[in-house]
């Protein structure tokens, strides 16, 4: 039911040329300590309870972006969880849109970007562009990675007919 409702909503909004953000991906079911909690979950429960609606929406409605959750999932923060962001979302579900952090959730921006994030929402101190520039200068970020992230962000605007 959740997947069907969200799919219809996202398709309707995006038909007007307005981008959408599907959130909070994934296993975000509490507000208490949501920035520090660690959701320990087995694969079957993850797939059947927490990911099934996301999968339906991603595959059918193709939202402009997916927002990663604050919490840790099996020890790794949502915004840098390679398994969820790259292996499941990108490779398995073939998602092409943007993957964005929640506000202030990119607590290791280089690791977040390398593990599947494409856009950071800032924390109270702002964006971490200096950290990314330094990582590029010292070779921790490659030209290909930078090109892929930039292409992804620009494709979102093109998909909405904004450029």
Name these PLM-found stretches:
Residues 1-163:
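Glycoside hydrolase catalytic-domain context in secreted enzymes
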């Amino acid at each position: 039911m959740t997947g069907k409702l969200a799919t219809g909503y996202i398709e309707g909004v995006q038909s007007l040329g307005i981008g959408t953000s599907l959130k909070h991906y994934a296993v975000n079911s509490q507000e208490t300590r949501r920035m520090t909690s660690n959701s320990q979950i087995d694969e079957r429960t993850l797939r059947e309870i927490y990911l099934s609606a996301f999968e339906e929406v991603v595959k059918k409605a193709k939202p402009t972006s997916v927002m990663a959750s604050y919490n840790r999932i099996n020890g790794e923060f949502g915004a840098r969880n390679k398994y969820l962001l790259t292996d499941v979302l990108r490779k398995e579900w073939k998602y092409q849109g943007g993957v964005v952090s929640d506000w202030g959730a990119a607590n290791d921006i280089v690791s977040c970007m390398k593990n599947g994030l494409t856009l950071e929402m800032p924390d109270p101190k702002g964006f971490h562009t200096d950290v990314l520039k330094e990582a590029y200068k010292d070779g921790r970020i490659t030209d290909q990675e930078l090109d892929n992230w930039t292409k992804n962000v620009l494709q979102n605007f093109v998909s909405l007919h904004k450029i």
